Amino acid sequence: MVHPVELPAWKELEALAATTGRRPMRDMFAEDPGRFDRFSARLGDLLLDYSKNRIDAQVMAALVRLAGQAGLPAAREAMFGGEAFNVTEHRAVLHTALRNRSDRPVPVDGHDVMPEIRAVLARMKDFAGRVRSGDWKGATGRPIRSVVNIGIGGSDLGPVMVTEALKPYQKADLAVHFISNVDGSHAAEVLKLCDAETTLFIVASKTFTTQETIANARTCRAWLVEKLGEAAIPAHFVALSTNGKAVAEFGIDTANMFGFWDWVGGRYSLWSAIGLSIALAVGFERFEELLAGGHAMDRHFQDTPLEANLPVILGLIGIWNANFLGADAYAVLPYDQYLHRLPAYLQQLDMESNGKGTARDGATVSWGTGPMVFGEPGTNGQHAFYQLIHQGTRLIPCDFLAAANSHNPLGEHHLMLLSNVLAQAEALMKGKTGAEARAELEKAGMDPAEIAFQLPHRVFPGNRPSNTLLYPRLDPFMLGQLIALYEHKVFVQGVIWNICSFDQWGVELGKVLAKAILAELSSEKTSSTHDCSTAGLINAVRQMRQ
């Protein structure tokens, strides 16, 4: 198996990084008035401007060659074709099938999975309709007014992000809450908002054994039983799981269990039954629009030439910035308060997928892989960490996202928001030269000695890369496109880095150690296998809890 650093295009890009990669983007824009048209791409109403990167036609051509040499087209077809692309768990990777809106069959081991997917969707539609209409009643005959999703990781981050993003579409008399953290304070604060008679709990755990989720589910079960009695459980609990035995033992009627499949990774599961909270919040028709948006991006990703393919372009630009220009992180900056949970969602999607140090063939990688991801909605982030992005010593490319139209057109608020996002992208690219800074200070009437002192602090180096994603309005279809865009971007990069993007063994070791420490915290014995720091902390916790 050929590693990326051995590919001809990789070596070509290393040479280009020493030339084009160091050129001021100011000069590139000055020399090419058509740069925006040349380095932007569209899918329907979604516009990607990637012109504010240190690229030219030669760099982009080399990046596309890199994708070809790394086997991206074949890998893409293998994933969509249901092959066991998750090599360490020997599983297909078919979250795309969950949003397949075509009549195409999707085979896994020779079996078309679409009939099963459609059957689950039909059950979700029926259930969501009954709850939203008031037909589904709690144990005392009152309709449901609060939904509490209990899950963690992919069973939480995706549904939380989507329900927050689609708040303008939510049913006014149905509140949707989420409990994820095993910290009891999370459950306690959510339960304060709920009336037991009108609350429906969704327990989201594929195996129904996830420690945090089951602990929270038991707490919520005890809360309900205390108020309404054991017989109330079937009317107030449903499960998203494949473990019917454990679900039944918990007291949930397995007729109210919605299943999914082992080829659905947690961080890709919002499209599955895990999205039930989304369907309850915004209605099943809106959930279908979300699926349709994801499917539209799937078709684009599968059918569009690499050089005009939005996920491929985003992925390749990320490779260029990370592996050739030295960026260890990138910032996701949605200028949309409804997308305030998008950075956290993309942290899991990107860092859990591509935070790997082992190649698909088992070799230790000698090249950079997944970057760190962080972000905040604009304009809040401008008053927090943008200082480092503008004038710090680390290169941090940015993805800006913005809708041209607001769901809440209050005065000039949205124009102010848009002016800020466009200004930030321009400022990062242009920077401010010493001459420009001097002219500003002189115009302000500053004396020469003070100017000499202040000048180095007022210069912005610029040449900071960014992408801008612009769309008319954030609706379910557009949100589906954006989520699938980033999913496929992560896939592209994982293929080029030659890593497995669909496992997450790194989360397992801590779980195992936590089980042992849990037992020790409630006893007086400390295992001799711990290092002195961990043993000391265990003893300190015991003393503080006495």
UniProtKB/Swiss-Prot annotation:
Q: Where is the active site?
A: 352 (proton donor), 383, 511
Give the enzyme's main class according to its UniProt record, as a single word.
isomerase
Locations listed in the record: Cytoplasm
Give the matching InterPro entries. Answer: G6P_Isomerase, G6P_Isomerase_C, Phosphoglucose_isomerase_CS, SIS_dom_sf, SIS_PGI_1, SIS_PGI_2
Please name the pathway.
Carbohydrate biosynthesis; gluconeogenesis; Carbohydrate degradation; glycolysis; D-glyceraldehyde 3-phosphate and glycerone phosphate from D-glucose: step 2/4
Query: Would you name any one GO CC term?
Result: cytosol
Top-level taxon of origin: Bacteria
| Annotated catalysed reactions | alpha-D-glucose 6-phosphate = beta-D-fructose 6-phosphate
Task: Provide the GO biological process annotations.
Answer: gluconeogenesis; glucose 6-phosphate metabolic process; glycolytic process
Could you cite one Gene Ontology molecular function of this protein?
monosaccharide binding
Protease as a keyword?
Answer: no
Q: Which family is it part of?
A: Belongs to the GPI family.
Q: What is this protein called?
A: Glucose-6-phosphate isomerase
